[in-house]
């Protein structure tokens, strides 16, 4: 059985944001605007996405 994944793309810069939000972007593996990563769809990843929802775009 394949695990469900979610694509996350950074749409805004982390400059000038709260340090915890910048750390969350790094934790998601995002490095720059336009960078896309594919992650497992787990509650912890969803929580990180919800924390920085205003800087990312999510595709299921």
From Swiss-Prot:
Single GO molecular function: structural constituent of ribosome
Cystine pairs: none
GO cellular component terms, A-Z: cytosolic large ribosomal subunit
Keyword Ribonucleoprotein: yes
GO biological process: translation
Alphabetical list of Pfam families matching this protein: Ribosomal_L30
InterPro entries linked: Ribo_uL30_ferredoxin-like_sf, Ribosomal_uL30_bac-type, Ribosomal_uL30_CS, Ribosomal_uL30_ferredoxin-like
Keywords: Ribonucleoprotein, Ribosomal protein
Stated family: Belongs to the universal ribosomal protein uL30 family.
HAMAP family: Ribosomal_uL30_B (MF_01371_B)
Assembly description: Part of the 50S ribosomal subunit.
Identification of the protein by name: Large ribosomal subunit protein uL30
């Amino acid at each position: 059985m394949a695990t469900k994944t979610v694509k996350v793309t950074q749409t805004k810069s982390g400059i000038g944001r709260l340090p915890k939000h910048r750390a969350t972007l790094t934790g998601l593996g995002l490095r720059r605007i336009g960078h896309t990563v594919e992650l497992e769809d787990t509650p912890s990843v969803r929580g990180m996405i919800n924390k920085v929802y205003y800087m990312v775009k999510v595709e299921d």
